[in-house]
């Protein structure tokens, strides 16, 4: 799908952050693993969340969805699978479910779309082989079989926290205690603690023995509960950058106290010189001069694409470090954003996981043709921010990629002054 994004009027208005995709994944799985009825409210049925709900229904739960909520009734047992579990393009769904699959007493196969089956699973591969379990991955899918055993687990702390969260879901249900030793540095710690927080709401506990070691008591049970998903800082980063550049934007629906790692966007924007206040009522942005900064992306890689846009629109140079994981997402996000921003006159370069972006707002221009969305939701949304921030109409392909995380994105930005034309 092609969309053209342009300014219908000067940027300004109020936008509500969508529900947190990260927290919704976790709540759905905890509810599915509990025996009984849980009610999850403030949901948005993106493709990723729909994949997790579908997997829960295949494995161990009855699921009924409403307009913005779901009732998940955990069966208290796993059911025989008649077909592979389709994770669509959701890395969280796949990586969270692999250890859970080891609880089912059967071989479980997973399929996916796009680049999902190309994304590395070496952490689980090594762990399963170490325990003598089956782990087979190919371009067509992934199959695991065999039961994890309680005990000592050692994982690199600088891999995706999704692997650690996946083990956190499954290990409390084993018969004995387990310990997760994370080899420092531990990145994305906030996402580990987010998993633990949602688990605690469903009655499952773990605790830090020290900054790198998690103790997970065995023999626990998830208990059903009612759970409300808070607003998503990862998605709010797009209107936040727009507000920082243009002013006049207010974001509502975000909890001031949160475990979401991408809440770091507010601290990062303050360092750029952005002017805003945060209250329970919302976050209003006022236009102010912005200057380049040095950013460590290790704990918040999803912010990378939109921060590359911001780097072009401020004075000076922005250096984004520890961004290697961007190359292993729905697209190679570094290469994708470099190509599209250069097509608009952007000046930037990368080496490995370091990206250098030069402020060049006065040199930006309309591209010669259609920009490519690279089938990546964050690339598409970042290019929309570029269009509205600069007043340069942009036509982007693969625009349907937004359904992965924020299906209503284009409608949501219209009250901020956007005009969106579909083709």
Named regions from a protein language model:
Residues 1-423:
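Short, structured segments at the rim of ligand-binding sites
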């Amino acid at each position: 799908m092609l969309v053209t994004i342009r300014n219908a009027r000067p940027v300004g208005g109020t936008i509500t952050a969508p529900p947190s995709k990260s927290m919704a994944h976790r709540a759905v799985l905890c509810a599915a693993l509990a025996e009984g009825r849980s009610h999850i409210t403030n949901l948005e049925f993106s493709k990723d969340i729909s994949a997790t709900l579908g997997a829960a229904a295949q494995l161990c739960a009855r699921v009924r969805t409403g307009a913005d909520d779901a009732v998940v009734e955990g069966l208290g047992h796993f059911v025989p699978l008649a077909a592979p579990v389709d994770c669509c393009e959701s890395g969280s769904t796949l990586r969270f479910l692999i250890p859970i699959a080891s609880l089912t007493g059967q071989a479980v196969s997973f399929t996916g779309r796009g680049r999902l089956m190309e994304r590395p699973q070496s952490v689980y591969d090594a762990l399963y082989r170490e325990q003598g379990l089956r782990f087979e991955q190919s371009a067509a899918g992934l199959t695991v079989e065999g039961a994890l055993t309680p005990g000592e687990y050692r994982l690199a702390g600088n891999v995706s926290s999704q692997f650690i969260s996946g083990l956190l879901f499954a290990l409390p249900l084993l018969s004995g205690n387990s310990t997760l030793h994370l080899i420092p540095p531990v990145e994305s710690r906030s996402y580990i603690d987010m998993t633990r927080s949602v688990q605690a709401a469903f009655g499952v506990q773990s605790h830090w023995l020290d900054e790198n070691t998690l103790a997970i008591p065995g023999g626990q049970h998830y208990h059903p509960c009612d759970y409300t998903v808070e607003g998503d800082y990862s998605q709010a980063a797009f209107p936040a950058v727009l507000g920082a550049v243009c002013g006049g934007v207010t974001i509502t629906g975000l909890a001031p106290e949160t475990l979401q790692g991408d809440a770091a966007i507010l601290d990062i924007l303050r360092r750029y010189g952005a002017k805003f206040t945060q209250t329970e009522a919302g976050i209003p942005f006022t236009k102010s001069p912005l200057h380049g900064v040095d950013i460590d992306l290790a704990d918040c890689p999803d912010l990378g694409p939109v921060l590359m846009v911001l780097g072009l629109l401020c004075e000076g140079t922005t250096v984004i470090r520890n961004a290697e994981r961007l190359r292993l997402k729905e697209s190679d996000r570094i290469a994708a954003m470099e190509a599209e921003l250069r097509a608009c006159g952007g000046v930037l370069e990368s080496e490995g996981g370091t990206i250098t972006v030069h402020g060049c707002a006065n040199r930006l221009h309309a591209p010669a043709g259609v920009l490519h969305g690279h089938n990546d939701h964050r690339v598409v949304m970042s290019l929309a921010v570029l269009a509205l921030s600069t007043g340069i109409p942009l036509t982007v392909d693969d625009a349907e990629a937004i359904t992965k995380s924020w299906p209503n994105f284009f409608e949501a930005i219209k009250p901020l002054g956007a005009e969106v034309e579909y083709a």
